[in-house]
C-alpha cells in the first residue's frame, strides 16, 4: 500500500467524532430501519395467527373438496345398473363397504359376494314354490269331448274303450253307399227299378254313426230280368224256365223291399208275392201267349 493511504486511514481513526454527531447520525438512520424491524416483528405474529386458525382452514378445505366431489356410481354386479347407493349406516366393516342396488333391490359388499336375499324378507326359493300353489297359471281341466276314433285309427279292434262314445265304428270291409248303385241295382236297359240283392237279416243290419242302415256286400245275380226284352226271339221262347226265373225275381223283390224297408211289417207283403209265384204255368202262359187272357 502507499504511505499516503495509510496516513489518511490512520487520521480518520484518530479523529473521533463528537457525541452529538453520532446521535444525529443514528436519528437519521432509524426511520429507514423501522420498517425492517416491524416486518421482522410482524412475521412471527402473522405466522402465529395463521398457525392458530390453520387447522380450521384445512378442515374446511377438505370438507369442501368432499362435498364438491360427486359420489362415484358403482355398477351393480347383478343387473349392471348405476342406480346404486352407498350404505352409511349398514356397514359392518370399513374395509368392505356395503352398497345397495335400487334396480334389483340387492345388497352387496365390495370384494364380497352378492346377496340373493331381497329387501324385506324371504328367499326366492320359497316364493317360487308358493306362487304356483297360490295362483296356478295353467289349470288342467278334464277333456269333456273325447275324440271319436275310426277303425283305421284304432290299434286293437278287440279292445273296447268305455270312455268313447257309444256310436258303432264303421267296418272296413263294408262298401260305400254309392257302391249300392251297381249294374244289379239299375240295369243298363232301364227296366229294373228296384235294387235286387240277397235277403237281409235284421241281425245283420249295421247302423252307422248317422243312424242309417248299412248293407253288407251284395252278390251280383245273374238274372237281372225275369224275361227277355229283346224282340229278336219269341215272347214265349223261355216259358220252360219261367217258374224258376219268377222265383228268382220274387226273391230279388223281397230283397229289395227288405233293403228299402228293413222292418218286420213288410213280411206280410213278401208272403203274398211268394204265394202268387208258386202258381202253375197257366198264369205265365196266359200272360205271354198271343191270345192273351187266362184264368188265375
Curated annotation (Swiss-Prot):
Disordered: annotated span: 41-69, 115-146
Cited PROSITE patterns: ZF_DOF_1, ZF_DOF_2
Residues annotated to bind Zn(2+): 76, 79, 101, 104
Presence of keyword Transcription regulation: yes
Gene Ontology CC terms, in alphabetical order: nucleus
Biased composition annotated in UniProt, kind: Low complexity: 45-62
A Pfam cross-reference name: Zn_ribbon_Dof
Biased composition regions of type Polar residues, renumbered to the chain: 129-138
Main location: nucleus
Zinc finger (Dof-type): 74-128
Tissue specificity remark: Expressed in the phloem of the mother plant, including in roots, stem, leaves and flowers, but not present in the seed and embryo. In maturing siliques, found all through the funiculus connecting the placenta to the ovule, but not in the ovule.
Compartments, as annotated in UniProt: Nucleus
Function in brief: Transcription factor specifically involved in the maternal control of seed germination. Regulates transcription by binding to a 5'-AA[AG]G-3' consensus core sequence. May ensure the inactivity of a component that would be activated to trigger germination as a consequence of red light perception.
Protein name listed in UniProt: Dof zinc finger protein DOF3.7
Organism: Arabidopsis thaliana (Mouse-ear cress)
Amino acid at each position: 500500500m502507499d504511505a499516503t493511504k495509510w496516513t489518511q486511514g490512520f487520521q480518520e481513526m484518530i479523529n473521533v467524532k463528537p457525541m452529538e454527531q453520532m446521535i444525529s447520525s443514528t436519528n437519521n438512520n432509524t426511520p429507514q430501519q423501522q420498517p425492517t424491524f416491524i416486518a421482522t416483528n410482524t412475521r412471527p405474529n402473522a405466522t402465529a395467527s395463521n398457525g392458530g386458525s390453520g387447522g380450521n382452514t384445512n378442515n374446511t378445505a377438505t370438507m369442501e373438496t368432499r362435498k364438491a366431489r360427486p359420489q362415484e356410481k358403482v355398477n351393480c354386479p347383478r343387473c349392471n345398473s348405476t342406480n346404486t347407493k352407498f350404505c352409511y349406516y349398514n356397514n359392518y366393516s370399513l374395509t368392505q363397504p356395503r352398497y345397495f342396488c335400487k334396480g334389483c333391490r340387492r345388497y352387496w359388499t365390495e370384494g364380497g359376494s352378492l346377496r340373493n336375499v331381497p329387501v324385506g324378507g324371504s328367499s326366492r326359493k320359497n316364493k317360487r314354490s308358493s306362487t304356483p300353489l297360490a295362483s296356478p297359471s295353467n289349470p288342467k281341466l278334464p277333456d269333456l269331448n273325447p275324440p271319436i276314433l275310426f277303425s283305421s285309427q284304432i290299434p286293437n279292434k278287440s279292445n273296447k274303450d268305455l270312455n268313447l262314445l257309444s256310436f258303432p265304428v264303421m267296418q272296413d270291409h263294408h262298401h260305400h253307399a254309392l257302391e249300392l248303385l251297381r249294374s244289379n241295382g239299375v240295369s243298363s236297359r232301364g227296366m229294373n227299378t228296384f235294387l235286387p240283392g240277397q235277403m237281409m237279416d235284421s241281425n245283420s243290419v249295421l247302423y252307422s254313426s248317422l243312424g242309417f242302415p248299412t248293407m253288407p256286400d251284395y252278390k251280383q245275380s245273374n238274372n237281372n230280368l225275369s224275361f227277355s226284352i229283346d224282340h229278336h226271339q219269341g215272347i214265349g221262347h223261355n216259358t220252360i224256365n219261367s217258374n224258376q226265373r219268377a222265383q228268382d225275381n220274387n226273391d230279388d223283390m223281397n230283397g229289395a223291399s227288405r233293403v228299402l224297408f228293413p222292418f218286420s211289417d213288410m213280411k206280410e207283403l213278401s208272403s203274398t208275392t211268394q204265394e202268387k209265384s208258386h202258381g202253375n204255368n197257366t198264369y205265365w202262359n196266359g200272360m205271354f201267349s198271343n191270345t192273351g187272357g187266362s184264368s188265375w
